[in-house]
């Protein structure tokens, strides 16, 4: 049975004091037993403190990015070894903002996936179409190509370390949200694409999260769809009560 997951991507928000405050709220408010695995992804500078604070809780911690190299002269970058050495064993890769703002290509993201898996990290792999792709009817092709280029090269045994996060880019930070029916349609397509490539066992086990402006008001309906296994949450993850409402919507 595949896992339900709610992951909060904090992006470039929360300084050290604010991070501690939000973590304290989440620890106090999120029940010890939930139907979903709960993960938060603070900024790099607050990861070590977050990992230490959450160590004996049921809340997991993730990095928002990692460099593809093992180490070396890469000013400003963070390696997988550095992350795992502080107890961070999950990483978000391929996020639409990394693709658009920092020009990360499918090939680069695939290299990052390989590096993370080499260090036994869980990868939350993000992918999804832009508005022009959906308007032109090309959204299924775009999603399939990003999947194939990003993760279809990995060995079957590595799929237990992969979580997929479908991001309709046109519904991120815009206030727009794919309808629950649109989300289910794409998630079903994604699962079927994986089934054709890797077989039913992997397709049925991989968790596919929805990552397009999930809020307390729409979470329950989106999460009720059979192929939606949770969410990658942005803005709503920055307020404890909003994030709690989304976590408990599963």
From Swiss-Prot:
List of residues binding substrate: 9-11, 173, 213, 234-235
Gene3D superfamilies: Aldolase class I (3.20.20.70)
Keywords: Cytoplasm, Gluconeogenesis, Glycolysis, Isomerase
GO biological process, one term: gluconeogenesis
Keyword Coiled coil: no
Xref: SUPFAM superfamilies: Triosephosphate isomerase (TIM) (SSF51351)
Active site (record annotation): 95, 167
Pfam families with a match to the protein in the record: TIM
PROSITE patterns, per database record: TIM_1, TIM_2
Gene Ontology annotations for the cellular component aspect, listed alphabetically: cytosol
Keyword Transferase attributed: no
Pathway where it operates: Carbohydrate biosynthesis; gluconeogenesis; Carbohydrate degradation; glycolysis; D-glyceraldehyde 3-phosphate from glycerone phosphate: step 1/1
Catalytic activity, EC: 5.3.1.1
GO terms of molecular function: triose-phosphate isomerase activity
EC top class, as a word: isomerase
Subcellular location: Cytoplasm
Transmembrane segments: none
InterPro entries recorded: Aldolase_TIM, TIM_sf, TrioseP_Isoase_bac/euk, Triosephosphate_isomerase, Triosephosphate_isomerase_AS
Catalytic activity as recorded in UniProt: D-glyceraldehyde 3-phosphate = dihydroxyacetone phosphate
Function in brief: Involved in the gluconeogenesis. Catalyzes stereospecifically the conversion of dihydroxyacetone phosphate (DHAP) to D-glyceraldehyde-3-phosphate (G3P).
Family: Belongs to the triosephosphate isomerase family.
Assembly behavior: Homodimer.
Name of the protein in its database record: Triosephosphate isomerase
Native species: Flavobacterium johnsoniae (strain ATCC 17061 / DSM 2064 / JCM 8514 / BCRC 14874 / CCUG 350202 / NBRC 14942 / NCIMB 11054 / UW101)
């Amino acid at each position: 049975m595949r896992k339900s997951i709610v992951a909060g991507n904090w992006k470039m928000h929360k300084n050290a004091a604010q991070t501690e405050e939000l973590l304290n709220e989440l620890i106090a408010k999120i029940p010890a037993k939930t139907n979903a695995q709960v993960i938060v992804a603070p900024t790099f500078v607050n990861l070590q403190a977050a990992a230490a604070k959450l160590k004996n809780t049921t809340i997991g911690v993730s990095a928002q990015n990692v460099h593809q190299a093992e180490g070396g002269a890469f000013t400003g970058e963070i390696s997988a070894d550095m992350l795992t050495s502080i107890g961070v064993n999950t990483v978000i890769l391929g996020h639409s903002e990394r693709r658009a703002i920092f020009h990360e290509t499918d090939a680069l993201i695939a290299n990052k996936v390989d590096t993370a898996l080499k260090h036994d990290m869980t990868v939350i792999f993000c992918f999804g179409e832009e508005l022009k792709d959906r308007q032109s009817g090309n959204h299924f092709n775009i999603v399939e190509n990003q999947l194939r280029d990003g993760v279809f090269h990995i060995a079957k045994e590595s799929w237990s370390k992969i979580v997929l996060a479908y991001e309709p880019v046109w519904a991120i930070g815009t206030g727009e949200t794919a309808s629950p029916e649109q989300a289910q349609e794409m998630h079903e397509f994604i699962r079927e694409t994986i089934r054709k490539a890797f077989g039913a066992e992997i397709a049925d086990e991989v968790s596919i999260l929805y990552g397009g402006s999930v809020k307390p008001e729409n979470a329950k309906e989106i999460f009720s769809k059979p192929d939606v296994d949770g969410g990658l949450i942005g803005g709503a993850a920055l307020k404890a009560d909003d994030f709690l409402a989304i976590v408990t919507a599963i």
